[in-house]
Each structure stands twice: as C-alpha cells, then as structure tokens.
C-alpha cells in the first residue's frame, strides 16, 4: 500500500515538472530556473551538450539532451551551468548567471533523480544508454522520502476512518445498550426529583395544618368571653325573705281605733 502511494507521489511530481517545463521553467535543488537560456553570461554562448561531452569523451556525467541550454546534470550546488569554448578550444564548464525563473509556486520541487531517469540521449546514430542518477542526488531523494510518509499517513487515516464506520452487530448492540442506560439514568433522575419535590410539598402542607390546629387549641380564653353579653341560667331558683302571715285568734285582737289608740 505504501509503495503504491510512493509511485503516485513520484508520478504527480513528474507531471508537475512537465507542466513547469512546458511553461519555460524547471526545478533544480529546490529552485526554479529558466529552461531556454543558451548563454551563461553576456557575450558567451553555450555549446551543445552532446557535442561538448563527445569532445571531452566523458561518460560519467549524464547528458541533459541534444540542446545548448543551461542545465545541472551533476547537481552542482551553484546551480545550472553549461560548456563554453575556451581560448584553446576545449569545452570549459561555466555556471550560468541570472537564470532564475520569474514564476513562483507553492508546490514542492519534483525529485531531480526522477527527471534525470526520464531524460535520454537524442543524438542520431547513438545507442540508447540508461542514465543513472549521480551520487549527490541522494539528498533530494531523501527529502522526497521525508514528505511521502506524511501524505501516506493522512490517506491511511482517512481510509481507516471510512472502514471503521461499519461497527457490526456487536457494535450496534453496545451502542443501543449505552443509549438505553443513558435514558434510564435520565428518567431515574427526573422521577427522583419529582418524588422528592412532591414529598416536600406534602410535608409542608401537613406542617401548616398542624400549626393551624395548635393555634386553635392554644387560643387565649379572652377570645371566648364577651363582657357585653352575659348569660343567666334559667334553672336558678330565686328565694325571697317574705314571712307567711299568722292566724288571728279571738280575744287577742287589740281594740284600736282608727287613730291607733287602744279602747277607742
């Protein structure tokens, strides 16, 4: 799986390099240079790569192709260069000046080794020779390897998240069980709160009724007496002090006149 991602990454970088090449620029050591500059400096002219390498009889350096533009086949840290004709007529290596491409991009530069593997010699009559990347191209390859795991991990995480969506029967059962437990806990909390609230209200009502009963029992006596309205018992017997008159006996009556004198 990781190897497939590496191939995809390299292919995208190659396509990106071709896109920039078609626009007149190419990547080299993290920089963007102009592709069609045939002069290393004012007044100088680059020699054809095949002609210059053929005259030098050097097979260790890879050939950039059948053209005379500034390139960097040996990964020179100074940047692109080309061969020029010296005073003695021997091809001489000369770094190119002012070859920076005015276009900018935020994409990472493609590995130079992948570009070099795609380039082949275009000289007529010559056999096609396999071009091997130089030894100093390893840092660029290591930089690409450092970037690859990051992209691969993010893609793997997305794939794993998609695969984990299907929880299976056990997952659904556990999910439903957890939902039932949560709902039961919530219902228990609501019922408990309602029961406690009703019990508190009932106790308050009973307490108020008890207080009213105690107030009725412990009222002062003045609340039951009214001085303006006194009642008398109807069965009370009234005893008077009048004496019963005695019987009058004959001969005992006093002879008194109207004037009250005896014998009158």
Curated annotation (Swiss-Prot):
One of its GO terms (biological process) is negative regulation of phosphatidylinositol 3-kinase/protein kinase B signal transduction. Residues 22-170 are extracellular. It is found in: Cell membrane. This is Phosphoinositide-3-kinase-interacting protein 1. Residues 192-264 are cytoplasmic. The chain crosses the membrane at residues 171-191. Its main location: membrane. Residues 1-21 form the signal peptide. GO terms for molecular function: phosphatidylinositol 3-kinase inhibitor activity. Negative regulator of hepatic phosphatidylinositol 3-kinase (PI3K) activity. Residues 24-101 form the Kringle domain. Disulfide bonds join 25-101, 46-82, 70-96. CDD domains: KR (cd00108). PROSITE patterns: KRINGLE_1, KRINGLE_2. It is a single-pass type I membrane protein. Keywords: Cell membrane, Disulfide bond, Kringle, Membrane, Signal, Transmembrane, Transmembrane helix. Residues 117-129 have a biased composition (Basic and acidic residues). It comes from Mus musculus. One of its GO terms (cellular component) is plasma membrane. Residues 94-129 are annotated as: Disordered.
């Amino acid at each position: 799986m990781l190897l497939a991602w590496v191939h995809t990454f390299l292919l995208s970088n190659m396509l990106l390099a071709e896109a920039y090449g078609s626009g007149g620029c190419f990547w080299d050591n993290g920089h963007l240079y102009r592709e069609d500059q045939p002069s290393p400096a004012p007044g100088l002219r680059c020699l054809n790569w095949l002609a210059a390498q053929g005259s030098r009889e050097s097979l260790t350096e890879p050939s950039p192709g059948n053209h005379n533009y500034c390139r960097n086949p040996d990964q020179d840290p100074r940047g692109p260069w080309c061969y020029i004709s010296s005073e003695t007529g021997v091809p001489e290596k000369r770094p190119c000046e002012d070859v920076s491409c005015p276009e900018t991009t935020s994409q990472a530069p493609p590995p130079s080794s992948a570009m070099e593997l795609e380039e082949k010699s275009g000289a007529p009559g010559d056999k096609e020779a396999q071009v091997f990347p130089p030894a100093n191209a390893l840092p660029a390859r290591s930089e690409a390897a450092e970037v690859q795991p990051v992209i691969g991990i993010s893609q793997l995480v997305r794939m794993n998240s998609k695969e984990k969506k299907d929880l299976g029967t056990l997952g659904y059962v556990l999910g439903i069980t957890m939902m039932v437990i949560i709902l039961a806990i919530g219902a228990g909390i609501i019922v408990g709160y309602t029961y406690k609230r009703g019990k508190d209200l009932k106790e308050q009502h009973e307490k108020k009724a008890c207080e009213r009963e105690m107030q009725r029992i412990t009222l002062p006596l003045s609340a039951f007496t009214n001085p303006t309205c006194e009642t008398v018992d109807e069965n009370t017997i009234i005893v008077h002090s009048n004496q019963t008159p005695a019987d009058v006996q004959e001969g005992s009556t006093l002879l008194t006149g109207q004037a009250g004198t005896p014998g009158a």
